[in-house]
Amino acid sequence: MAVVTMKQLLDSGTHFGHQTRRWNPKMKRFIFTDRNGIYIIDLQQTLTYIDKAYEFVKETVAHGGTVLFVGTKKQAQESIAAEATRVGMPYVNQRWLGGMLTNFTTVHKRLLRLKELEAMEQTGGFEGRTKKEILMLTREMTKLDRTLGGIRDMAKVPSAVWVVDTNKEHLAVAEARKLNIPVIAILDTNCDPDLVDYPIPGNDDAIRSAALLTKVVASAVAEGVQARAGLSADKDAKPEAGAGEPLAEWEQELLSQAAPAAEAAPAAEAAPAAEAAPAAEAQAAPAAEAPAAEAPSTEA
């Protein structure tokens, strides 16, 4: 079964790129056409690249790896936090701190400080201090939780990084590449594909598009975790098809191009079975019927 369908991608607006004047020429091979001054991304390629990224993430997690989810733009913050939390992976959805990967030793010390402050608050460690001291400690804890709360349980640098909008998260991409950490990312028409190891051509500005593709990556993580535990894949982890708005004619045309390819395989399998059925019925027919069928020819 496909990880995600063409209709789901169309419904979420994954095929919409940027205006034709705002593009990266390196993305030309991923562009299907342009409509009203806006590039349309080739979703056939998107489906292919989704499968590649899905398999990579699943295998990475199955072998004990972790995937860091990164998306600090408003359109992606909620889905990044929700999906990463669902599958127990670290995430950054506020501000990317410089050195979060390349200087992880220092970042890890700040994580220990965050846990220390939280423990103090829960065990009554703030008691006996002045109001000003309590206020300063509370502010420090709040700030650390806002910026580092998503990676509080990350004990080492991740095995891979999932990025929504490589242009906005250029620091995260640069640090990952410096450490040779594979980058999986949504590539809009204004992005540089050379910076990404596992690209997924698509719209990184629409909330539904970013949420759908993030859910696909999270589903791959979930399947990898289950494979690591020796459990069967959970079908509910796959994204569900949502009811969308009516498709335009050119969108229906794009969708129809994918239909013959999807129907070809089942049709090819069904043909031999259809031919075999009459032969099986002929062999199973009673012997008494054969003379009755031949009787007219003998009299003639």
Curated annotation (Swiss-Prot):
Note down the stretches annotated as region Disordered.
Answer: 228-300
Locations of Low complexity compositional bias?
258-300
Report which superkingdom the organism of origin falls in. Answer: Bacteria
InterPro entries to which the protein is assigned, alphabetical: Ribosomal_uS2, Ribosomal_uS2_bac/mit/plastid, Ribosomal_uS2_CS, Ribosomal_uS2_flav_dom_sf
Disulfide partners = none
**Gene3D superfamilies hit by this protein:** Glucose-6-phosphate isomerase like protein, domain 1, Helix hairpin bin
| One Gene Ontology cellular component | cytosolic small ribosomal subunit
- The name of this protein is Small ribosomal subunit protein uS2
Task: Provide the GO biological process annotations.
Answer: translation
Q: GO molecular function terms here?
A: structural constituent of ribosome
State the family named in the UniProt similarity comment for this chain. Belongs to the universal ribosomal protein uS2 family.
Q: Which UniProt keywords apply?
A: Ribonucleoprotein, Ribosomal protein
What NCBIfam families does the record tag this protein with?
A: rpsB_bact
